[in-house]
A protein has these predicted regions:
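Nucleic-acid nuclease catalytic cores
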Residues: 80-86, 93-172, 193
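Iron-sulfur (Fe-S) cluster-binding segments and ferredoxin-like electron-carrier domains
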Residues: 38-39, 192-194
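Metal-dependent nuclease catalytic cores that hydrolyze phosphodiester bonds in DNA/RNA
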Residues: 1-102
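A general structural signal for short secondary-structure boundary/capping elements
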Residues: 70, 148-150, 183-188
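Non-catalytic, well-ordered alpha-helical scaffold segments
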Residues: 17-21, 85, 117-121, 184-187
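Extracellular/secretory pathway and lumenal proteins
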Residues: 33, 190-193
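Immediate flanking context of iron-sulfur cluster ligation sites
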Residues: 20, 167-188
């Protein structure tokens, strides 16, 4: 199939904006990423329904300033470099320094895989590209534990994020869906039966 693509089609594949959520999906399971983003498959379960309800509450609040921090919700980002688009749950802006910090809301609790951190770091990369300023950290807020976890965007995490982005781009451009690789994580996946 690749041999039949025109030069313009190849360029379009390389410049396709990858959804921020695809990075987290890929880190969790490449098959899940392909099912959602290539095949447009989706199935609700109680976990996805809880996550949707959480984001509806977060997204419904208006911007506000409190104790020197401006809280902007539902921030749309789209950057050609590194080629990502999506919606940030919350961006905190220090009113004195202008420093930005993305905050991602998650339904559950901290996970052993780095998917949440990779998705958050990608948000920081988007803000950097859009504003020209360094975004050195963000935070993950977990509903289940009601705990906020700071995340430093180290050189290692940035490299891991860019490597994941490249892998997602390759997967989505291939149009292929990997076979199932069953494990403990499949119990929580709404797409496990697909």
């Amino acid at each position: 199939m690749t041999a039949l693509l025109t030069e313009t089609q190849r360029e379009n594949q390389d410049t396709r904006l990858i959804p921020l959520s695809a990075l987290q999906h890929y880190a969790f399971c490449p098959r899940q990423c392909a099912l959602i983003h290539n095949e447009q498959a989706w199935a609700e379960n109680y976990l996805t329904a809880q996550g949707k309800a959480l984001h509806e509450r977060v997204d419904s609040d208006e911007p506000e300033t409190h104790k020197g921090v401006r809280f902007e919700r539902t921030v749309h980002v789209s950057v050609e470099k590194p080629g990502i688009s999506g919606i940030l749950d919350l961006v905190e802006a220090d009113t004195k320094t202008g420093r930005l910090k993305p905050v991602e809301y998650k339904r559950g609790k901290p996970k052993p895989d780095p998917g949440d951190e990779i998705q958050l770091c990608a948000q920081g990369l988007c803000l950097e590209e859009m504003t020209g300023q360094t975004v050195s950290e963000g935070a993950l807020w977990y509903m289940q534990t009601r705990h906020r976890v700071p995340v430093v965007f180290s050189d290692g995490l940035r490299a891991q994020t860019l490597a994941t982005l490249a892998a997602v781009r390759e997967l989505l451009n291939s149009g292929q869906t990997p076979p199932p690789d069953y494990g403990k994580r499949c119990k929580a996946c709404s797409l496990a039966e697909i």
